[in-house]
Amino acid sequence: MSKNIHKHRILILDFGSQYTQLIARRVREIGVYCELWAWDVTEEQIREFNPDGIILSGGPESVTESDSPRAPEYVFNAGVPVLGVCYGMQTMAEQLGGKVESSDKREFGYAKVKLVKDSELFHNIEDAITEDGRPELDVWMSHGDKVMEIPVDFVTIAVTPTCPHAAMANEAKRFYGVQFHPEVTHTVQGARMLERFVKEICHCEALWTPATIIEDAVARIREQVGTDEVILGLSGGVDSSVVAMLIHRAVGKQLTCVFVDNGLLRLNEGQQVMEMFGDHFGLNIIKVDAEERFLSALKGIADPELKRKAIGRVFVEVFDDESKKLKNAKWLAQGTIYPDVIESAASKTGKAHVIKSHHNVGGLPDDMKMGLVEPLRELFKDEVRRVGLELGLPYNMLYRHPFPGPGLGVRVLGEVKKEYCDLLRRADAIFIEELHNADLYNKVSQAFTVFLPVRSVGVMGDGRKYDWVVSLRAVETIDFMTAHWAHLPYDFLGHVSNRIINEINGISRVVYDISGKPPATIEWE
């Protein structure tokens, strides 16, 4: 009998902070299951979830505005510990009778917080000792408003020179508020604070580990699928690969994977996928060579959004054709992960904004009458990777840089042609190979090559050449929300450029993209 890995659970209410998912990831890293919900949940939903503790996230709004979000009243009557972070602390203070004011001086960035009273939250946690002998913490602040009066029965447990109540506590009710962000790495002891809250204050046991997640997923897949057959679109990416391994472990040959080679993959990628999953791991795989079909659908299309939609549409058509041949398949497996679930379940106050359409969300035919199997829908990407390692997938494959769903379709600018894809594949392979050779691959967050549909004059020997241009792109980022261009050594870039131009007939010039995000996006399209 597998352990109940959901036995202990934390509920995180999202007030719109860019860091909210980080809170959830930190709690999961502690080994405890948690879910992230919009702030406007009902008492009934909270009761049904039955959390051992609740965390109120930060957010961009001001508590001083009458229509700003508030925690459901039941949060403070549920009898469980509550931790308010930044905006979460402010709304806790205001809702429980304290006073919050807008400040003309924002606190943003590193700050030193002095602990003025002992508390369960900060027990044995310090970065330094002040002259008067009190513990001090190095933290990350990001707020304009501040708590000016704490509620009755609360005590101030930390201060900064500009923030009279940097943290507060009601030890009897186990309510805590911190004005800083313990979830970000800049708050040096942040992970320990969250661990104290989750384990010592909420009394949660660490049951959420890669091994127990696999055990639980396998049991659930077996229960759901029974003796039926399952079909999965295997791309060779992290999510679909881990889904394939999980379902294969659960039901073996009842799983059939369909690998669609759309002509938009990296160099030798199709061959690598077939060798790894078919030959090495022994999965049932059908390989569909659909390059011509995809390139034909992309003919004459230059707009990036239209290209994405065309690629998505053709994938669905090809997959649908193959699934109809598998008469006994009753279940469709998908690599949906928790951030996809969070995105689609946006708060009913709805403030989401689409920047780029995602090729893998929705879009399956209405007449595909199959049940869905989504074994990763509770997991963040970093958890998916750790589960993959536990399942025996190679590290280099799981921690490879992100590759867009539409593949080279959005790395060839403008119209996609076979000639362009072939040139780009080879140029990109050289760039990635050299990053590995120079031990730079894992020092950048993402690196790739872009094909520019413009010709440039070059010189080769005594002759003049008039060939295509490619751009190298490498960025450093923590969360892919913002990114800096990677300052790769000039001699390295020169070496890569020489190799590409000398080894690939058809490319005459290599440029390096030095745009950050913002204002640019990481991918060009």
UniProtKB/Swiss-Prot annotation:
The keyword Nucleus does not apply. It catalyses: XMP + L-glutamine + ATP + H2O = GMP + L-glutamate + AMP + diphosphate + 2 H(+). Residues 9-207 form the Glutamine amidotransferase type-1 domain. One of its GO terms (cellular component) is cytosol. The active site is at C86, H181, E183. Residues 208-400 form the GMPS ATP-PPase domain. Pathway: Purine metabolism; GMP biosynthesis; GMP from XMP (L-Gln route): step 1/1. The keyword ATP-binding applies. It comes from the Bacteria. Its EC number is 6.3.5.2. Homodimer. Catalyzes the synthesis of GMP from XMP. This is GMP synthase [glutamine-hydrolyzing]. It comes from Tolumonas auensis (strain DSM 9187 / NBRC 110442 / TA 4).
